[in-house]
């Protein structure tokens, strides 16, 4: 199987040609429902109802599950949509806001049980549908943006986050927690010492141990060993990552840091990362920078050209 390649094809058809249990990780962000029209036959996101949209994505990701290794991980970025009247809405897809990246769509955006102006709940509808299709739903990560796209709404808070779901094929899977661990603040380290200085003999703040005499006897009086104090903690599920503009396309892309975090945690070094909605190639760029291989699938030939320009060529 060739890697470090970009496949210009419908994602479902392309996935069907890849071997079973061959890919370590998927990091992707499919087109959001009823926000943009990219002028492509078979494009996802232009369905008449959310139910049809979700059904198509479940079919794509069902095929993804086949090619994913048993220990593989699937990181899915998805945002929500409001029910509307069919007029062009003011909300802009943060990944593709203007120009060459499609036109605003005029879809009624009706959903069973939803009224006009209701938030549809696309992320959770999709997550539950994927769980019903056999995926393990392991985490709902909030991607919080300090620089979100502005909205003109005056009767609700402006949106500044999206979901990143971690799903897996099996109960046991590759996950490198240490690779994305967060540093502990100095104030937290001080709490571990109970306010004592680093040369204190005892600490009552080592979790689960009560008063513990220092194992390090380098000084005759003994002192508290800083090696007992953790310097990192398990990464939390709110990630503060700004969007990053891409000057070549005049739009904000899926941030490299977001893709890199998913890849570091979910794909071993030298492994293969796939993105069936490759867009301008951020997942491939991140995979390459981290010593992983990539496979990108993209329906739009213009995006394929953008991705190749960003990544700097392909193998094979």
Please provide the spans of the model-predicted regions.
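Core catalytic lobe of class I
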Residues: 1-316
């Amino acid at each position: 199987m060739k890697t470090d390649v970009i496949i210009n094809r419908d994602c479902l058809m392309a996935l069907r040609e890849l071997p079973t249990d061959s890919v370590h990780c998927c990091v992707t962000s499919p087109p959001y429902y009823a926000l943009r029209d990219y002028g492509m036959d078979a494009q996802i996101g232009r369905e008449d109802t959310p139910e049809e949209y979700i059904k198509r994505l479940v079919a794509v990701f069902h095929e993804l599950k086949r090619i994913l290794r048993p220990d593989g991980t699937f990181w899915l970025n998805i945002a929500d949509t409001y029910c509307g009247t069919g007029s062009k809405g003011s909300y802009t897809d943060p990944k593709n806001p203007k120009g060459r990246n499609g036109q605003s769509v005029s879809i009624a955006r009706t959903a069973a049980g939803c009224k006009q102006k209701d938030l549809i709940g696309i992320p959770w509808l999709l997550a539950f549908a994927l769980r019903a299709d056999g995926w393990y739903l392991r985490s709902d990560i909030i991607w919080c943006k300090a620089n979100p796209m502005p909205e003109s709404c005056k009767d609700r808070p402006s949106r500044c986050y999206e979901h990143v779901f971690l799903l897996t094929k099996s109960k046991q899977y590759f996950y490198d927690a240490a690779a994305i661990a967060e540093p502990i603040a100095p104030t937290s380290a001080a709490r571990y010492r109970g306010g004592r200085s680093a040369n204190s003999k005892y600490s009552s703040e080592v979790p689960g141990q009560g008063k513990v005499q220092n194992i390090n006897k380098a000084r005759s009086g003994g002192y508290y060993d800083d090696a007992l104090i953790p310097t990192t903690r398990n990464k939390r599920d709110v990630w503060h990552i700004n969007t990053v503009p891409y000057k070549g396309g005049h739009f904000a892309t899926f941030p490299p840091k977001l893709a890199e975090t998913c890849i570091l945690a979910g794909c071993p070094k030298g492994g293969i990362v796939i993105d069936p909605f490759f867009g301008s190639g951020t997942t491939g760029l991140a995979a390459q920078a981290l010593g992983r291989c990539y496979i990108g699938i993209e329906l739009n030939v213009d995006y394929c050209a953008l991705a190749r320009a960003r990544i700097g060529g392909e193998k094979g």
